[in-house]
Curated annotation (Swiss-Prot):
Keywords: Ribonucleoprotein, Ribosomal protein
A Pfam family of this chain: Ribosomal_L36
A GO BP annotation: translation
Annotated GO MF terms: structural constituent of ribosome
Origin organism lineage: Bacteria, Bacillati, Cyanobacteriota, Cyanophyceae, Gomontiellales
Naturally occurring in which organism (per UniProt): Cyanothece sp. (strain PCC 7425 / ATCC 29141)
Family recorded in the similarity comment: Belongs to the bacterial ribosomal protein bL36 family.
Protein's UniProt name: Large ribosomal subunit protein bL36
One GO CC term, this protein: ribosome
Length: 37
């Protein structure tokens, strides 16, 4: 899980979602998981 000020899609499988007020990226590739923080 990467914590970044600005999250963006890295590949075409990445999905930008909101969970509990946080913007997150979920993907089939675990290296692409990100959270805004």
């Amino acid at each position: 899980m990467k914590v970044r000020a600005s999250v963006r899609r890295i590949c075409e499988k990445c999905r930008v979602i909101r969970r509990k007020g946080r913007v997150m990226v979920i993907c089939a590739n675990p290296k692409h998981k990100q959270r805004q923080g």
